[in-house]
């Protein structure tokens, strides 16, 4: 079940500071893949010539922190997020003469038509309250011969985390923001906006060995929403994670995220 999108909640609670997002990013270092998700995306989109790039929903700047130096000479990157806290964090992580930062809303972009060679909307469309408007805006600001890249998650992505939480406490939230724009929804919706779509899928497992990082991830979906769980909820969750780590050497979680390269 999906959660109703409330931009004020996202701006003033979930993403006011970078702490919760960083907790949700940290867990992915336990990937069994030889490359991180950000590296996988870079290898898929293959930026081979200079251009003007817009990233909508830059978050902490994780993608360009890794890849800005790899861009062809003459490239320009505009990193945006609807949270000023996020753009400030991104600016502290990424620097260069060819990068700029702005606060922007994917549903109401202030840029000219056909302004960018590449428009990136990675794991952000489920935050849009009006998906139709957001997708039209992404397409509008992209050049006719440019590309819009979109990533999201499958309904099955990290599902074990939520199923475990729900078993421990019925108050644990299973109405995930991501469920408003999953892979399964994107497969149906995106062809209505783009004539050509190349879909790539990154499916892998996390083998988590740090219990505190695991619990920080769990908290990041509970605390910003002021949801009250039982006093011993995190202790019991810790016991489950600890038990699996003791038995297998790690706590295993499946993740699945698609990339859509749209033209």
Task: Describe each region flagged by the PLM.
Residues 1-51, 62-66, 86:
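Conserved class I S-adenosyl-L-methionine
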Residues 54-108:
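Class I SAM-dependent methyltransferase SAM/SAH-binding core
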Residues 107-118:
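A short acidic, Gly/Pro-enriched loop at the edge of an enzyme's catalytic core
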Residues 4, 34, 60-62, 180-184, ...:
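Conserved Class I S-adenosyl-L-methionine
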């Amino acid at each position: 079940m999906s959660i109703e999108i409330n931009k004020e909640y996202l701006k003033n609670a979930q993403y006011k500071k970078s702490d919760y997002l960083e907790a949700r990013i940290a867990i992915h270092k336990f990937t069994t893949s030889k490359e991180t998700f950000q590296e996988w995306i870079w290898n898929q989109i293959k930026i081979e010539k200079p251009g003007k790039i817009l990233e909508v929903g830059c978050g902490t700047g994780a993608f360009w922190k890794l890849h800005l130096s790899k861009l062809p000479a003459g490239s320009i990157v505009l990193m945006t997020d609807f949270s000023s806290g996020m753009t400030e964090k991104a600016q502290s992580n990424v620097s260069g003469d060819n990068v700029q930062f702005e606060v922007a809303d994917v549903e109401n972009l202030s840029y000219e038509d056909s302004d960018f060679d590449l428009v990136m909307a990675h794991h952000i469309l489920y935050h849009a309250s009006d998906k139709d408007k957001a997708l039209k805006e992404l397409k509008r600001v992209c050049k006719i011969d440019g590309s819009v890249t979109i990533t999201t998650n499958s309904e099955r992505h990290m599902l074990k985390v939520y199923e475990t939480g729900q078993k421990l406490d019925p108050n644990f939230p299973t109405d995930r923001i991501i469920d408003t724009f999953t892979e399964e929804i994107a497969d149906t919706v995106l062809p209505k906006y783009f004539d050509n779509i190349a879909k790539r899928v990154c499916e892998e497992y996390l083998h988590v060995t740090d219990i505190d990082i695991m619990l920080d991830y769990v908290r990041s979906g509970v605390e910003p929403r002021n949801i009250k769980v039982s006093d011993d909820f995190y202790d019991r969750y810790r016991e489950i994670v600890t038990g699996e780590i003791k038995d297998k050497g790690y706590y295993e979680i499946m993740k699945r995220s698609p990339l859509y390269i749209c033209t």
